[in-house]
């Protein structure tokens, strides 16, 4: 039988893995076809960078959620912090569905703006429970900020 903390870590990794899998499923078929044909801004990173970047970010997200949950549901702010985390996780998966699956940079942009706000809220709530957990999400908000600019530029260039 798994210890309570190991069980929590497995659930956190599983939740993040599910979100990333949904995103990957929506993305993988569109990259060599639709996405490759889009006009992109000069600051578009090389395609090979996205996989390692998201892998690291998803790992940090899972560990951050675990650090919050490790405090226990009875600790102040834990339930709210994890609820907001789950909201942003759903929005994260939906971005790939909107942008790549539906091939809609506009829907992706709307989603990523709401996602950005949800990540900021998650960071605030995580900091209140666990400073290391909040710090672990700072690269995530930085990357999503960049991704939002990239999304907006792709929308503008392909209208």
Model-derived features: where do they sit?
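N-terminal signal-anchor transmembrane alpha helix
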Residues: 2-26
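Cytosolic, membrane-interface loops and tails of multi-pass inner-membrane proteins
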Residues: 30-44
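Helix-adjacent hinge/juxtasegments
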Residues: 59-96
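Membrane-interface helix caps and helix-loop-helix hairpins in membrane proteins
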Residues: 75, 95-106, 127-131, 156-157
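Hydrophobic alpha-helical segments of small multi-pass membrane proteins
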Residues: 82-91, 95, 109-122, 140-145
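Terminal transmembrane helical module of multi-pass membrane proteins
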Residues: 125-159
């Amino acid at each position: 039988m798994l210890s309570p903390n190991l069980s929590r870590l497995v659930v956190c990794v599983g939740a993040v893995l599910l979100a990333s899998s949904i995103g990957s499923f929506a993305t993988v078929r569109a990259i060599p076809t639709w996405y490759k044909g889009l006009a992109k801004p000069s600051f578009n990173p090389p395609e090979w960078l996205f996989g390692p970047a998201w892998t690291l970010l998803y790992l940090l997200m899972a560990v951050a959620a675990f650090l919050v949950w490790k405090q226990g549901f009875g600790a102040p702010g834990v339930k709210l912090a994890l609820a907001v985390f789950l909201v942003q996780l759903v929005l994260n998966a939906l971005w790939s569905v909107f942008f790549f699956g539906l091939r809609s940079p506009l829907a992706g942009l709307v989603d990523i703006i709401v996602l950005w706000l949800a990540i900021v809220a998650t960071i605030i709530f995580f900091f209140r429970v666990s400073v290391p957990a909040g710090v672990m999400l700072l690269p995530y908000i930085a990357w999503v900020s960049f991704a939002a600019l990239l999304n907006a530029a792709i929308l503008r260039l392909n209208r």
